[in-house]
Amino acid sequence: ANKLTILMALMFDKYVAPQDIPTTGITQITKEKIEEARANNCTIKLIAHAKKLENGEVEYEVKPMNMDNSHPLASINKEFNAVFVKGNAVDDVMFYGKGAGPLPTGSAVLGDVIDIAKNVMK
């Protein structure tokens, strides 16, 4: 939720406090849900999702989601994080890097997102 707060502020000029983002953790993922995902060629990933709607509102949430194994986010593992962007000015773009653990941060990935956002808004 913390990273999503930062990304939404940058991309949509909208601040939402992390505690106000609907969040579902991974504790509800059962063995059966994992097996069902595998049977459907999917991987369960904890996804922070935000989307600007046609009416200007922004919908957002953090929750486990089934990602088709062909989707680039399905291959992100361990301490790595990724930001997958769909935009009008760019096709699908993914930024990837270490973003968890005591030393690595998502600053490099975030820096790339900021640079692209600045160029898209020119």
Task: Give each language-model segment a name.
Residues 1-75, 80-82:
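Substrate-binding/catalytic subdomain of NAD(P)-dependent oxidoreductase enzymes
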Residues 49-51, 57-122:
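Catalytic, metal-anchored helix/loop core of enzyme active sites in primary metabolism
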